[in-house]
C-alpha cells in the first residue's frame, strides 16, 4: 500500500501510525493541535492493549512509566465488597494491568512515531471534509486549504470525528454520564478500587511517585449542580455526605480548574467503513468507561485493521473484513459497559437487589477473573498471532 492518512494524533491515531507503518510505504498524520497532547488523566492498560504495545516493542517502556495493578475491588457505599477480581494471567508479562498517566503513554507513542521516517506529520491542520474515494480536505493554521489523496484514510479523531461526520457514515452519538477526573498527590491502595453509590461511581488507582488517579461521577443532580457552578467546595460537600473517602481525595484538588469534566458519549455506526475511509477507537465505538476498554480496544483495532491489509485483498475489502471481525465484538463490550454504568448508580431499593446478586461472586472469586479472561482472550490471541508485525516497518 502506498499512502495512508491517519486523522488524529491521540493514543489511537499514534498506535495506528505505528502498526500501519508495517503496511504502508508512506503515511500522513493529521492533527488539529499544533502541539499534540492527550486529553485525560490516566488509564488502566489491560492485557489486550498491553500485548499490542509488546508487539510494537514499547511495553517495557510503558510499564516503567506506570504502576502494576494485580486486582480490583468494587464496593458499595457502606464499603462492603461487591466484587473482587484478580487480573487474569496471559503469560509473558501479561499477568497484570498497568495504571499510567495518559500524557506519559502519549509521549511514548509520539516519540515512537517520530522514529518512523515514512510518517509525515501535519500538526495544526483540521480535517474539514472526507470522501469515500480516499480524499481528505484539511485546513491548516499556517493558512490555506488542501486535499490529500490516499489508498486508505483512518479516522482516529475521537468521539467528535470529522472523518465520521463528513465521510458518509451512518452513525448515532448518544450522551451518557458525566465524570470529574484528575491526578493528585496521595497514597492509595496498590490496586484499583471502585465504589458504587447513588451518585454514581467513585474510584482510584495508584500512579506511583506518591500520585493517585481518581474519578467521581458528576451526573446526579447535586453533583451536576456543583459542577455547573464550578463550585469545588460544593462538590466536596455532596460527596462527603455520600462517601467520605471520595471527599478525602477531592480535598486534595487545588482548584476546580484542575478537574477534567467530561460527559461520556456512546458512538454507534452501522459500519466502520465508507469506501476507503475507516474508523478506529472512539471515532468508531466510544463507550462508557466502566470496563476500561476505550484505549485498549483502540490499540486492538489498529492491529486487526492492519492484519486485513496485509492479507492480499484490496483496501475496500480489507476494511469490510475488519468491520465484520471487530464491530460485533466491540458492540458487546459497549453494551456491557453501558449496563455497568447504570448499575453503579442505582439507589435503594434496587441497589440492595444488585448487591445481593453480586454477593454470590464473592463466594466464588474465580467468577470475576474467569469472565475477564474470556472477554480478553480473543484479542490477546489475535494480536499475538498477527502476521503484520513480520513485515518490516517503513
Task: Annotate the PLM regions.
Residues 12, 35, 160:
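Conserved Rossmann-like nucleotide-cofactor binding loop
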Residues 226-258, 315, 323-324, 365:
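Flavin-binding catalytic cores
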Residues 5-22, 30, 155, 258-345:
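Conserved mid-domain beta->alpha element of the FAD-binding
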Residues 192-224, 236-243:
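Active-site substrate-recognition segment that forms the wall
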Residues 5, 28, 120, 213-215:
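A structural signal for isolated positions on well-ordered beta-strands in alpha/beta enzyme cores
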Residues 2, 64, 291, 307-394:
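C-terminal helical "tail/cap" subdomain of flavin- and related membrane-associated enzymes
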Residues 1-4, 21, 46-167, 172-185, ...:
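Conserved N-terminal helical subregion
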Residues 21-41:
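Glycine-rich FAD pyrophosphate-binding loop
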Amino acid at each position: 500500500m502506498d499512502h495512508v492518512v491517519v486523522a488524529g494524533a491521540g493514543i489511537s491515531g499514534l498506535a495506528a501510525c505505528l502498526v500501519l507503518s508495517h503496511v504502508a510505504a508512506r503515511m500522513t498524520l493529521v492533527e488539529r493541535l499544533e502541539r499534540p497532547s492527550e486529553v485525560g488523566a490516566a488509564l488502566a492498560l489491560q492485557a489486550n492493549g498491553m500485548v499490542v504495545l509488546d508487539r510494537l516493542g514499547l511495553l517495557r517502556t510503558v510499564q516503567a512509566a506506570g504502576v502494576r495493578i494485580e486486582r480490583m475491588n468494587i464496593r458499595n457505599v457502606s464499603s462492603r465488597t461487591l466484587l473482587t477480581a484478580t487480573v487474569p494471567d496471559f503469560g509473558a508479562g501479561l499477568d497484570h494491568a498497568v495504571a499510567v498517566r495518559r500524557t506519559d503513554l502519549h509521549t511514548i507513542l509520539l516519540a515512537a512515531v517520530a522514529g518512523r521516517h515514512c510518517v509525515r506529520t501535519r500538526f495544526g491542520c483540521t480535517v474539514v471534509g472526507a470522501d469515500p474515494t480516499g480524499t481528505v480536505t484539511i485546513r491548516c493554521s499556517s493558512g490555506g486549504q488542501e486535499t490529500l489523496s490516499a489508498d486508505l484514510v483512518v479516522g482516529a479523531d475521537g468521539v467528535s470525528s470529522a472523518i465520521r461526520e463528513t465521510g458518509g457514515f451512518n452513525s448515532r452519538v448518544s450522551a451518557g454520564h458525566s465524570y470529574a477526573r484528575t491526578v493528585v498527590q496521595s497514597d492509595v491502595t496498590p490496586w484499583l478500587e471502585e465504589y458504587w453509590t447513588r451518585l454514581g461511581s467513585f474510584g482510584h488507582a495508584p500512579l506511583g511517585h506518591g500520585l493517585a488517579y481518581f474519578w467521581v461521577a458528576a451526573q446526579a443532580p447535586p453533583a451536576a449542580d456543583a459542577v455547573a457552578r464550578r463550585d469545588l467546595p460544593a462538590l466536596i460537600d455532596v460527596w462527603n455526605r455520600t462517601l467520605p473517602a471520595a471527599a478525602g481525595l477531592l480535598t486534595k484538588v487545588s482548584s476546580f480548574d484542575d478537574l477534567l469534566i467530561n460527559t461520556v458519549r456512546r458512538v454507534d455506526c452501522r459500519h466502520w467503513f465508507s469506501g476507503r475511509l475507516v474508523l478506529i477507537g472512539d471515532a468508531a465505538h466510544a463507550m462508557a468507561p466502566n470496563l476500561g476498554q476505550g484505549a485498549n480496544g483502540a490499540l486492538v483495532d489498529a492491529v486487526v485493521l492492519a492484519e486485513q491489509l496485509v492479507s492480499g485483498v484490496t483496501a475496500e475489502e480489507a476494511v469490510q473484513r475488519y468491520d465484520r471481525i471487530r464491530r460485533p465484538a466491540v458492540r458487546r463490550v459497549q453494551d456491557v459497559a453501558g449496563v455497568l454504568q447504570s448499575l453503579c448508580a442505582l439507589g435503594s431499593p434496587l441497589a440492595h437487589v444488585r448487591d445481593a446478586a453480586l454477593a454470590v461472586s464473592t463466594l466464588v472469586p474465580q467468577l470475576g477473573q474467569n469472565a475477564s479472561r474470556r472477554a480478553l482472550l480473543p484479542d490477546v490471541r489475535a494480536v499475538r498471532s498477527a502476521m503484520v508485525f513480520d513485515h518490516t516497518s517503513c
